[in-house]
Amino acid sequence: MLVLSIRIKVWQTMESEITKRIVVPELEDILYKEHKVLDKGFVRLVDYMGSDESVVQAARISYGRGTKSVSQDAALINYLMRHSHTTPFEMCEIKFHIKLPIFVARQWVRHRTANVNEYSARYSVLDHEFYIPELDHVATQSEDNAQGRGNSLSNEDAQYVTDLLKRDSDMVYETYNKFLIKGVSREISRISLTLNYYTEWYWKIDLHNLLHFLRLRSDVHAQYEIRVYAETMLEIVKKWVPLTYAAFVEYCLESQSFSKSALSVVKKLIAGEDVAREDTGIGKREWRELMDVLADK
């Protein structure tokens, strides 16, 4: 075993010395490490290709590192991001191993620009692991957003909800086990399980489409349970491509876009004019969102 261990270490050392691929030390440090998300989930980086350098190289259609400075690279990446030149960002790819509740996975796969291979409950038995929200995340239905949360319930009501969720989740797993013991096929037995049970998958995507995913899913309006995954992945992207990340924050993540009518309102307000919503043709919701942006809420 000692000889084998030495050989493995020598091979790993040789590999790191002879590789010609772009290596990001900050990512090498976290390869295969679990980043805990929710109560039992995680995000684990398993592979990546490229870096900020790859984006710049693709944009310049050149080979090698060249002689450009970091400031010039940053300026170019800012330009690409600002003007939505997406192809250079597609030259970088990243692959994650993710453990997440099934209901989160069903939202996630609406982003169809990634490669996914999921744990199959047709071939394997699912573990007795399910998601139960923290009490402060159990809330009423939002009154102005058909797919969002409103105010948090009282601790007593939230505890009642989570107790029932746990009871039902345990109960359906007991039923699942009974089916398996009876010899019922795994593909039928799994039907009894609830959407809060955990699944796992490998998820590979290019940088451009990853940023689009993260812009939508890290937004405050995204469901909390998927947002925390996006926030974890954002931190990994920050280590991977810091120049691209900075441009993304500047021009996408923390920027605002306006409709033609909203932009007209902004111009009038800057000019000191009084503007009434009824005179603009803007709906109540868009108007409220515009006023919130201008008030920096």
Curated annotation (Swiss-Prot):
Extent of motif ThyX motif: 110-120
Keyword Nucleotide-binding: no
This protein's UniProt keywords: FAD, Flavoprotein, Methyltransferase, NADP, Nucleotide biosynthesis, Transferase
Pathway participation: Pyrimidine metabolism; dTTP biosynthesis
Annotated GO MF terms: flavin adenine dinucleotide binding; NADPH binding; thymidylate synthase (FAD) activity; thymidylate synthase activity
InterPro entries named in the record: Thymidylate_synthase_ThyX, Thymidylate_synthase_ThyX_sf
Enzyme Commission numbers on file: 2.1.1.148
Keyword Flavoprotein among record annotations: yes
ThyX domain location: 41-251
Free-text cofactor note: Binds 4 FAD per tetramer. Each FAD binding site is formed by three monomers.
Domain of life: Bacteria
Catalytic function, reaction form: dUMP + (6R)-5,10-methylene-5,6,7,8-tetrahydrofolate + NADPH + H(+) = dTMP + (6S)-5,6,7,8-tetrahydrofolate + NADP(+)
GO biological process: dTMP biosynthetic process; dTTP biosynthetic process; methylation
Active site residues per record: R217
Required co-factors: FAD
Binding site for dUMP: Q107, W108, V109, R110, E118, Y119, S120, A121, R122, R190, R217
Binding site for FAD: T87, R110, H111, R112, E118, D206, L207, H208, H212
Assembly and binders: Homotetramer.
Listed HAMAP family: ThyX
Similarity field: Belongs to the thymidylate synthase ThyX family.
Biological role: Catalyzes the reductive methylation of 2'-deoxyuridine-5'-monophosphate (dUMP) to 2'-deoxythymidine-5'-monophosphate (dTMP) while utilizing 5,10-methylenetetrahydrofolate (mTHF) as the methyl donor, and NADPH and FADH(2) as the reductant.
PANTHER family linked to this entry: FLAVIN-DEPENDENT THYMIDYLATE SYNTHASE
Name the record gives this protein: Flavin-dependent thymidylate synthase
Gene (UniProt): thyX
